């Protein structure tokens, strides 16, 4: 999923189209396109907080990831990415190289059971509750990471 402004960037547009990215210009269309993509057997990576966070600040999640998962009726697997030392964050210029080589770590969590959320009505409440569950999960992961 790519923010709509990048689709208008002449330097990026061709790469975005060729890579098969989905635009976030219209949320309803984005959710439909993502659900169709998942139901077609493809995978999808969604960063509910956006692609780059500011270290030390609390997460602010968008509801798109939850809305997509519920619309596609798919498996939702949380993945935590950590980077030491911190680099490529929103408050740091991309060309600022860390003083030592950085290491990326990926931790794949257990699948999240969506059945309880599918039963909630209205749908908007289910999306909000699932988003909150994701926020709680990743906040706990961040705290666990920061303690080590």
Predicted regions: what is each one?
Residues 1-27:
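Catalytic core of membrane glycerolipid acyltransferases/transacylases, capturing the structured
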Residues 6, 52-53:
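Short histidine/acidic/glycine/proline-rich micro-motifs that form metal-
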Residues 10-13, 36-43, 54-121:
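A cross-family acyltransferase "interaction/gating" segment
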Residues 30-34:
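Short acidic active-site motifs
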Residues 84, 107, 115-148:
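Membrane-interfacial terminal anchoring regions of lipid-handling membrane enzymes
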């Amino acid at each position: 999923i790519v923010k709509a402004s990048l689709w208008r960037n002449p330097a990026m547009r061709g790469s975005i189209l060729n890579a098969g990215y989905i635009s976030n210009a219209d949320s309803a269309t984005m959710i439909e396109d993502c659900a169709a993509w998942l139901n077609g057997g493809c995978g999808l990576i969604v960063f509910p907080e956006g692609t780059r966070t500011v270290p030390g600040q609390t997460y602010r999640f968008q509801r798109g990831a939850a809305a997509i998962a519920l619309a596609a009726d798919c498996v939702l697997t949380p993945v935590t990415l950590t980077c030491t030392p911190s680099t490529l964050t929103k408050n740091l210029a991309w060309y600022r190289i860390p003083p030592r080589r950085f290491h990326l770590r990926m931790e794949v969590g257990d699948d999240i059971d969506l059945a309880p959320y599918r039963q909630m009505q209205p749908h908007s409440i289910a999306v909000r509750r699932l988003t909150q569950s994701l926020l709680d999960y990743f906040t706990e992961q961040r705290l666990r990471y920061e303690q080590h």
